[in-house]
Amino acid sequence: EKGTIEERTEPKKLFPQAQSIISIALAYPTKLKNAPRNTAGNRRGIFSRTSWGEDYHVVLRDRLEKLALFIDSKIDDFECKIMVDTGELSDRAVAERAGIGFSGKNASIITKEFGSFVYLGEMITNIPFVADKPVEDTCGDCRICLDACPTGALVQGGQLNANQCLSFLSQTKVSLADHFKQKLGTRLYGCDTCQLVCPYNKQVDFHLHEEFEPDPEVAKPLLKPMLQKSNREFREKFGHLSGFWRGKNPLQRNAIIALAHFKDDSAVDVLKEVILEDIRPVIRETAIRALGEIQTERARLALDKVSEQVTEAPLIEEIEKALAKYRQGKIS
């Protein structure tokens, strides 16, 4: 997290003229129009809804800058400092105090109008605007999100164990433990489970901002082509998404995990090519493990083939583990 404790809790440390903070929330869509089908041989992954459409950091900053220009046209000597997600302040803490919504047990701000499917941003200003009142927390005894979390990352009271959270894990660049890979499933970036099950999000689907309208082929992309794109092609396809901020490594790793989840025999040749030609250890290791999960004769033969060419000891060990699964299981 950015900044010191003082900077994250005392706005005047960031903006000496601070008198008030304006918090904004923009709703984003939750349903894909004309979503492409996920079929055998053409398997697809899914980006979380926070990464549909144009990068929300860009859009919210644009809205805040326009708001600042409007206020400046009405008030002399207006000054402000704009933040969207990457600033020192906690967007959620600011939004909660501003009355945008309350902090739910799913660690999200829940609004009356739009549920928790909102992006947050704020500006510190030198104008003493009248403060709004916080919204009452109405989660009550409900614990649907806590029980639904795939990894048990949500703790009672709206706290989150980030090291268990699939959204956080999907953005890391390391090899994932097998139990986390199984839980990740077809997720390429982020996780929406704790929001989708929330009663306040029932039938919530707002298409109010054109920039957030998703391209179905980007939000739910084919998996195999994700492993065959050059850096330039990958950026052209996904570079405008907020989910691209960590680069292509986590996304390609997660695409491989998704192919393993589907036990997609049609991906064997692509995975073999990754193992033999890619230079990234995590990507190669994940591909080896994927061949071990697919459990088909073609996948076993591919492992035999790569075992003859791979020379790195850690990868040789992974190949042996993958082949051992074939000796233990049934090949389809």
Predicted regions and their residues:
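Amphipathic alpha-helical scaffolding segments comprising HEAT/armadillo-like alpha-solenoid repeats
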Residues: 233-238, 264-276, 296-308, 330-332
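Structural detector for internal amphipathic alpha-helices that build alpha-solenoid repeat scaffolds
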Residues: 252-264, 273, 284-296, 316-330
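Iron-sulfur cluster-binding cysteine motifs and their immediate structural context
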Residues: 144-167, 187-211
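Short, charged low-complexity linear segments at domain edges
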Residues: 110-134, 161-180, 231, 235
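Auxiliary alpha/beta "docking" domains used to position bulky ligands
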Residues: 1-138, 315
